[in-house]
Amino acid sequence: MAEIIQERIEDRIPELEQLERIGLFSHAEIKAIIKKASDLEYKIHRRTLLKEDFINYVQYEINLLELIQRRRARIKYSFKKDEIEYSMVHRVQGVFGRASAKWKDDVQLWLSYIVFCKKWGTKTHLSKIFSAMLAIHSNKPALWIMAAKWEMEDRLSSESARQLFLRALRFHPECPKLYQEYFRMELMHAEKLRKEKQEFEKAAMDMGDFDHPEEILKGELARIIYKNSISKIKGAEFHVSLLAIAQLFDFAKDLQKEIYDDLQALHTDDPLTWDYVARRELEIESQPGEEQPVSKQAKAVEMGRREERCCAVYEEAVKALPTEAMWKCYITFCLERFSKKTSSVPLRGQRLERTMLAFRKAHELKLLSEVQYKQWIDLLLRQDLFKEALQVAEAGTELFKDSVTMWQTKLQVLIDSKSPDVEMRFEEAFAHLKPQVCLPLWISWAEWSESAKSQEDTEAIFKKAIIAVTGASSVTLKEKYLDWAYRSGGYKKARAVFKSLQESRPFSVEFFRKMMQFEKEQEPCKMVNLREYYERALREFGTSDSDLWMDYIKEELNHPFGKPENCGQIYWRAMKMLQGQSAELFVAKHAMHQAGH
């Protein structure tokens, strides 16, 4: 092994001598490079090979290459690249080759190899790398697409890209992304041929080998892919994705029309089809051939007409397809348009009216989802229509009695409208909902009570909540209760609440840390109380939380009434209680602290 390493170091000598001779590196730097290179070579030639060693080797060489580039730029010296950089790049490729052969399954390693070759100008090597990678990772469509794009965009070889896509589709005959990218590639190829033809015609040159059939120039190959793909992959979503790609190419108008017509013919029962057809009206001028509107008012009128046409299509859609999904598309469109900024008051009014009407119609047909009831309520509240918002909230909770979100929305409307029935409605919500989902409502009730009721009433709510909410959900509630106690009654009240809850498991570390913080804000801050809180916290989390132990030690060291002599005992207790990685982490933190970091 020593002979191999020596030989590889000797292979570096010519490039290192050149680096020193042309003044890019000093003699001392060259010696440091040789020492580092020897260490790295040893690691990648020992019997037990580690991937990290190969990665470190490559990273060191890349860093060195980049440093050479920067120093070349600084002294404006660009010669001897074949003797320096090319030699280094070739060596890195060899290391990447060994690593990718050893760890074939590591996709990230292959991708790093590819990125390196692209950056350092060894693109001729890339075809072989892609072939080797795809032989192992043929089950990953994204890698086939990457290879095909490289052939098309970097090597300008549409034929090689086409062959890769065809091979990929044999492995993945029902992969939408492959068909989409293959379709895009053929359209790009046709566009490129058309531009070449135009250039030849402009120059009045003989077309020769560039004289392609008219069908190819019109995108016939893309059309064949489209037809094959829709026979394999069903659904309007895929169909629409191909149409969106085709619309990027102006020459493909006939293909766009064919795809659009097929979409309407094949997917009339899919809400996405209707949604696409309706939204398309936004792009079509109301009166083709006429001058475009110039003034803001004229533009607003034109936009109003387009939106009206969209809504007419949606109205037809919800009659033909009266489903929740179809109404969702319609309402989403209305909300999107209403959220668009406009200085036109009439246009904004039209948008609001259309949105409200769509919500009402869907509600009457019982085709509104829970989310849309919430959207409707939010919209009404933004317009200060509290009475209508409450009516909608009532209807929503009737339909979705088991939804805590719906109840919370309704209760928030009652709170915002300063209803006298808030307390009664909270009780009603708890009667309908399962206790384990009620945490958000208990918190809302307590927050409302804090601003609207007496301290006694608020505490009564917290006490009820602690009994009602059990398990992990109760942790947040206890923290909220402690916070409220400190806000409303100061430290004395918070300590009383802490004492009352200290056996009501489960807890969070934050629960104890809050109490420690409250203590630290007192004058004087009593170390005896801090010890009590740390001990209570460690009883619950001493086996896993290394930070608690470290903070306890620091407290004894830094507090005016701390006992530094206790630190040794705390350290050994921590070592006994902490388990696994937590113990290792604690030892490392303790060592850092002792070293003054």
From Swiss-Prot:
Protein's name according to its UniProt entry: U3 small nucleolar RNA-associated protein 6 homolog
Keyword Nucleus applies: yes
Functional note: Part of the small subunit (SSU) processome, first precursor of the small eukaryotic ribosomal subunit. During the assembly of the SSU processome in the nucleolus, many ribosome biogenesis factors, an RNA chaperone and ribosomal proteins associate with the nascent pre-rRNA and work in concert to generate RNA folding, modifications, rearrangements and cleavage as well as targeted degradation of pre-ribosomal RNA by the RNA exosome. Involved in nucleolar processing of pre-18S ribosomal RNA.
GO biological process assignments: maturation of SSU-rRNA from tricistronic rRNA transcript (SSU-rRNA, 5.8S rRNA, LSU-rRNA); ribosomal small subunit biogenesis
Pfam family, any one: UTP6_C
Major location category of this protein: nucleus
Organism: Mus musculus
GO molecular function, one term: snoRNA binding
Subcellular location: Nucleus, Nucleolus
PANTHER family: HEPATOCELLULAR CARCINOMA-ASSOCIATED ANTIGEN 66, U3 SMALL NUCLEOLAR RNA-ASSOCIATED PROTEIN 6 HOMOLOG
Subunit structure: Part of the small subunit (SSU) processome, composed of more than 70 proteins and the RNA chaperone small nucleolar RNA (snoRNA) U3.
Similarity comment text for this entry: Belongs to the UTP6 family.
GO cellular component: chromosome; nucleolus; small-subunit processome
UniProt HAT repeat ranges: 121-153, 156-188, 304-335, 488-520, 524-557
Keyword Mitochondrion carried by entry: no
Keywords noted in UniProt: Nucleus, Repeat, rRNA processing
